[in-house]
């Protein structure tokens, strides 16, 4: 038997599901992802609740445990990744996974917080919240990978690879995947993954 719920709060941050509290509307309204991540900000403010209610994904808010400020958010959803079989007959197989669909820091919070602490917020949230949820869900439903469609910015891709442990596919497999399942909203992004 498995635990239906896992508790992931820490001394520094509390995790809350997007629709848990009406108070979160004000927190979301003041969220700023910064000038290079306006799409992530717009998603949280304009689309996340609708997608949540439609059952398309789950969005989580990460709140500072002391000040209750919104530090960041992330969105997870399940997915299947097509992979070619080696039979040479054009058959496809699939690999089950979880997509880290959205992940953004509140830039206002980050600027203030990094002046007073050495905590790397993104890594901390990934390590203490995102990975444990993905692994928990994997044990329940059988997901094999955690994947992301990363913007093709060298600094961001390096962060995903060197800090968070994601890998890229060989170019021909990336093209294969792109031709079949990459969403239009991820146009130009690079598929990255890690085993669960």
How would you name each of these model-derived features?
Residues 149-153:
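Short loop/turn motifs enriched for small/polar and acidic residues
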Residues 1-116, 124, 128, 132-147, ...:
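Non-catalytic substrate-recognition and accessory regions of acyl/acetyltransferase enzymes
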